[in-house]
């Protein structure tokens, strides 16, 4: 199956349950950047990313629209700490801002539990979540 080059993408991001509520409160999600273990690989489709789905171990899923499609910021560990987060595994992070005032109900519930890949951030088409 070939990818639709026009389709909006969703960043699927596993977060610890203790961190998920703070991310939703702040409208911020982040992933490790650089050469640290678990850092995200920016691949084709990233520029079409319009949503973020936060989950914990493939469950407790929350879908939100990004404030700026396909864009992200690079923050230091210290900048995240100044926003109330406690990052532990890298010096730099990819940060995305989302509209935390309007959670989006999604009609499809794809399998997010995929062994070790459950915990890796990935980009998936919006059609995996909405009809």
Each PLM stretch: what is its role?
Residues 59-131:
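Aromatic- and Lys/Arg-enriched surface recognition patch
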Residues 1-49, 54-58, 103-131:
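Compositionally biased, charged N-terminal/linker segments
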